[in-house]
Regions:
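Glycine- and other small-residue-rich loops at beta-strand/loop junctions that grip anionic moieties
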Residues: 28, 89, 115, 140, ...
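Alpha-helix/helix-capping structural signal
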Residues: 67, 243-244, 289
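Conserved phosphate-binding/catalytic region of the ribokinase-like
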Residues: 1-21, 27-28, 33, 37-54, ...
């Protein structure tokens, strides 16, 4: 794991690999001697390959699935059904796969997005924003269908009342688009597949994933049910909530015992990790022989949209950095707490340093 100072140095070197130790020291308000010690340590860790400075290319992540525009409306008071409610609206790039990719980029990871958007102003806006955040978008295809939209209605406290997803453009994402990304998939450290994928696209991605830790994010109950038969030993992890777990396994998940039984059926299919969102209780991380309960972190909720996406992105970030699944899950909870406290679906100031500080602060007795 890198220290906060090492990550700050790497961030500067990514922008300017020829930056010298004196300039680094000035930018960070420290001494050249201190910078040289950190540079030496980064070399020992294999992150910097030489002076100049040459940064080692980490395996990075590939995320395949939905990219759309989020349209959010929030009520000014407790919402009343079957009538209009005063409130305010906003629009920003979204989509589960795209959100995960942007979060990973903001955490400093190399990430490719594989998706489809329309040849329309919404698609242009989405791609411009996503690329500016650091996501590689050369494998995002264009279609004549309109760019997908996710319309969410939030109550006064930021909790979701209802959402409607129009993912017609993502339905254009088939095996051919996945095949075009085969080289970046083969070299990835983590591959994330979201439940917006068609069955044939999901199957093809799994066929290309040999040797790559592959994670399936179900997205919703209907989408989990549609793809449940594709889950097998090609997957490293599955990340459902309780309702999605029931849809994936055709088993009840009302009690804790039932949740464990349902998770065991995924293990029996060859899935190594089942990471279950348990609502206010936090999450369960299950292997074939261990259950780790991870409590949710307290947060002042501004908007719950995107919390699960940041949680999974932070999980992947720690895996790419060599951490354990438990470390990754705890890091994910801290990222989710930061995200729900923000009005943004992807928190723009999200960094590993901020997440670590939040984790340390909220885990204090």
């Amino acid at each position: 794991m890198l220290t906060d100072r090492e990550e700050q140095i790497l961030d500067l070197l990514r922008r300017d690999p020829l930056m010298g130790s004196e300039a680094l020291a000035a930018a960070l308000g420290t001494t050249r001697a201190s910078i040289n010690v950190h540079i030496s340590n980064l070399g020992k860790k294999g992150v910097i390959l030489g002076r100049g400075y040459v940064l080692a290319e980490s395996p990075g992540a590939v995320v395949i699935g939905g990219a759309n525009m989020d349209l959010k409306a929030r009520s000014q008071a407790r919402a009343t059904s079957h009538t209009s409610n005063p409130g305010h609206g906003s629009m920003a790039p979204g989509g589960v796969a795209r959100n995960i990719a942007e979060n990973l980029a903001r955490l400093g990871d190399r990430v490719h997005l594989v998706s489809v958007v329309g040849r329309d102003p919404l698609g242009e806006n989405l791609l411009s924003h996503t690329a500016a955040a650091g996501v590689r978008i050369e494998h995002v295809a264009r279609t004549d269908r309109p760019t997908g939209t996710y319309t969410a209605v939030l109550d006064v406290d930021g909790e979701l009342i209802v959402a409607i997803a129009d993912m017609a453009a993502t339905a254009e994402l088939g095996p051919d688009q996945v095949q075009a990304a085969r080289d970046v998939i083969a070299s990835a450290g983590v591959l994330v597949l979201d439940g917006n994928l068609r069955r044939d696209a999901l199957e093809h991605a799994l066929d290309l994933s040999g040797g790559v830790r592959t994670i399936f994010e179900p997205v919703s109950v209907p989408k989990a049910a549609a793809l449940k038969d594709a889950l097998d030993s090609r997957l490293y992890a599955v990340t459902p909530n309780r309702d999605e777990l029931a849809a994936l396994t055709d088993l009840p998940t009302r009690t804790d015992r039932q949740v464990r039984t349902a998770a065991a059926t995924l293990h029996a299919r060859g899935v190594e990790l089942v990471w279950i969102r348990m609502g206010g209780r936090g999450s369960w991380l299950l292997t074939t022989d261990e259950l780790i309960e991870i409590p949710a972190l307290r947060a002042d909720v501004e908007d719950v949209t995107g919390a699960g996406d940041s949680m999974l992105a932070a999980f992947c970030h720690v895996l790419l950095d060599g951490g354990t699944p438990e470390q990754a899950a705890r890091f994910g909870h801290a990222a989710a707490a930061l995200t729900v406290a923000s009005a943004h679906t992807v928190r723009p100031d999200l960094t590993p340093r901020l997440i670590r500080a939040t984790l340390e602060q909220k885990e204090l007795p």
